[in-house]
Amino acid sequence: ECLALYEELEILLYQTTSYTSLAVSVDYTDTEAQKKDAKMTALAAEIGSRLSFIESEIADAPEELIRAAMDKTGRAKHYLAEILREKPHRLSAETEKVLAALRPVFNAPYDIYHMTKLADMKFGSFTVNGKEYPLGYSLFEDEYEYEADTDVRRAAFRAFSDKLREYENTTAATYNTYLTQQRIMAKQRGFADMFEADLFTDHVTREMYDRQIDLITEKLAPAMRKYARLVGKMNKLDRVTFADLKLPLDAEFDPRVTIGESREYVRSALSVLGQDYADMVDEAYDKRWIDFARNVGKETGGFCSSPYGCNSYILLSWNNRMADVFTIAHELGHAGHFRLCNGAQSLFDTNVSGYLIEAPSTMNELLLAQDLL
């Protein structure tokens, strides 16, 4: 009964914190949204601190008692198994309570980085051959990196990099703070190092991690170097710089895509996953799960948030490019995954390893590519 009530409260917290944090992601310059999110974050930390005794008391119970409870319970079985797995690395109940209260402080490096990047940086414009071009994070990443005009593309890269360089010390100090925090917590919890702690959280062994890095270095790197040379050849570049790597291989074919056309492409590609999945694609467009607008202060790239008990919310900056269509297919992979996951399992079973979480979304990109071919 305790865990059932605890899950209900955690679901409510998940939904409310998602509501306030997503409002900030849409526009980091919205001070009212920031205030609401800060209040909700503080409240969630206070509640988490007050309720931290639940996991501490479970972890302090004899292992045989926890395993007996796992055999009798349904929705909480994996939750109890995870507490048992983490038991050797838990600290005292009082320490865990304090750490839960300090969660907003632990999140500070992430928050500072995003506020610097999305609220404080003012890119202005740059000029090429007497013409002035506006510049921004999304404009650079989603537009100028694909620009066919080499002078404009490379000038945009220089202007963008120059602005980032103005904040390099702040960014470095923020990242160093995060690493210091992670190193200290890893040591306090009895891990050999930060790597072991992070991989433990993701249910991944060091051997798996090293194998992936080695595979990328040994197998992917040569192919990517060959690809870079091919980009230079097909686009008739004097040399290939970092500013040129997003150019299409076919310089003569870079079609613009409307939002309506993106729906047709994505639905066609993903219909192979069944009618329910195709219906979800339609629902995402019809019920406005997707925030397409490109505005100042908006989170860059694309992401999908799937609060338990709610539909998913997808954020991206639409630029009428085929790359955006792939982003939607990718993020709908997360939406489909968590629709099934959340619908069939306890909230406590939805914290998925990063090694698994990107599989459905990457598969959707492959399905889209296959369908286009």
Label each residue range with its predicted role:
Residues E252-V257, I290-C310:
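Catalytic zinc-binding patch centered on the HExxH motif and its immediate surroundings
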Residues G333-L347:
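Catalytic Zn2+-binding segment of zinc metalloproteases
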Residues Y313-S317, A344-G354:
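Short beta-alpha connecting loops at secondary-structure transitions
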